[in-house]
Amino acid sequence: MSANDKQYISYNNVHQLCQVSAERIKNFKPDLIIAIGGGGFIPARILRTFLKEPGVPTIRIFAIILSLYEDLNSVGSEVEEVGVKVSRTQWIDYEQCKLDLVGKNVLIVDEVDDTRTTLHYALSELEKDAAEQAKAKGIDTEKSPEMKTNFGIFVLHDKQKPKKADLPAEMLNDKNRYFAAKTVPDKWYAYPWESTDIVFHTRMAIEQGNDIFIPEQEHKQ
């Protein structure tokens, strides 16, 4: 993928992608959010604002960090390529966080569904963690389906390309479990939190049509 395919995404664009996705995600009724770092952190925080309901406790956000992308050249290079192996850099300490996944609706957030490798790994490992917690409590989720942990996924962009890993078909086919704010061509999407020159980045996003797309008069204060 060449630098000519690079699409700049502004903070405004990210904010509004979360805004337009929130109503659908409310149908999932997430009890907690798990953000995949670093791309999922800011979308998760913005999304939580739009999911907030009066009189209801704020949804907790937890962070995991996985390594998949590796820079193939020197610092400052414009070339980035997908790695082939996922490794944990940071995971949830369930005991310290007093976090119980059993019976919860858990929303996993990342910025992009690219090769799907990272999302597959995160979902698989979190499902294992939930199963272990249920087993430790003596809960059989087959006999008590209300205690099953339900996972959903939200991404800003789903790239239309062959994926290197799978997600469960029942998730992908359920509009209330898999949420992509926008389906996009297979290009290089540069997000604002990766930028070292946000003024240039924002100008490019505006020129490419990747900035504000909801008219101001539709905003709710």
UniProtKB/Swiss-Prot annotation:
The keyword Acetylation applies. It comes from the Eukaryota. It catalyses: IMP + diphosphate = hypoxanthine + 5-phospho-alpha-D-ribose 1-diphosphate; GMP + diphosphate = guanine + 5-phospho-alpha-D-ribose 1-diphosphate. Keywords: Acetylation, Cytoplasm, Glycosyltransferase, Magnesium, Metal-binding, Nucleotide-binding, Nucleus, Purine salvage, Transferase. Its cofactor is Mg(2+). Disulfide bonds: none annotated. Subject to feedback inhibition by GMP. InterPro entries: PRibTrfase_dom, PRTase-like. The modification N-acetylserine is found at S2. Pathway: Purine metabolism; IMP biosynthesis via salvage pathway; IMP from hypoxanthine: step 1/1. Its EC number is 2.4.2.8. Its main location: cytoplasm. One of its GO terms (molecular function) is metal ion binding. The active site is at D114. It holds the Pfam family Pribosyltran. The magnesium ions are essentially bound to the substrate and have few direct interactions with the protein. It is found in: Cytoplasm; Nucleus. Present with 36500 molecules/cell in log phase SD medium. Belongs to the purine/pyrimidine phosphoribosyltransferase family. PANTHER family: HYPOXANTHINE PHOSPHORIBOSYLTRANSFERASE (PTHR43363), HYPOXANTHINE-GUANINE PHOSPHORIBOSYLTRANSFERASE (PTHR43363:SF1). Dimer. This is Hypoxanthine-guanine phosphoribosyltransferase.
